[in-house]
């Protein structure tokens, strides 16, 4: 049986957004204008996050991810009378609550007809590890439907399952109750950020509640959690799983500069004969250059991991369940995906 690892980026969620129609309600590229309710006041969340609100109103025509980038720019924030520590922290709180709402919508609209779920179902028993750069819980929702246990080093868990590493944070992560104790509320009265503590995973009914310390990296921000106790050991566990991986899927990875060190480390941890699957409608040229010299396949169908007839692209023989045979040309790529005989 082949071993499959998953590396998931924003394209995974965008795929589901198009499939389900969620993108017409909540465009994940424009979260600041979502109608996110404030857990403390019941009014609009942005109204309770004054520095972020001021930053956005000063840049109403900029793409939202560029606004978040400005939240990290101390010189710019100072030039308009803002404290960049507060703008970054309020950005984390906003993104955590906003994408909690988004995750609940994903769960409501989830369908087993979605092509990526069909692919995951076909390969359920081969999946040995997963790494996600997304805050949302779409991958977790799919794994829950498959009854495939996962573990992210959270304290409130029995400690078994495949590794699910979320180094940029997750909307259901929260610091342990006994690590830093106070009653969170919006507007913020306590400014708590970047403390390396243990974590718990929140239940779904707890997602739309104020956080003591939001755990999410702001878009365009280098990972500040890389050495944290819930990230570094999880990365080591994941990298150990990669050593025996036959296929590694990079699903919807943007390969932005801020993410490259983490993505490059994954690529460098893979066996030389591991087949890399780049599932992306527009594969980043820099990423293709990074994996050149290795066996790789590109899946760029906008409808997901399916062929022109809608059949799921398989990484095993559908009749026997055995691994696919490699092409005779010694490319290292399975025969049915190798272009040498087309």
Regions found by a protein language model. Give the residues of each.
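A Trp-anchored, charged/polar loop motif used as the substrate-binding/catalytic surface
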Residues: 110-114, 149, 223-240
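Short secondary-structure boundary/capping segments
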Residues: 19-29, 144-149, 265-266, 342
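A short acidic (Asp/Glu
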Residues: 15-20, 139-144, 176-179, 259-264, ...
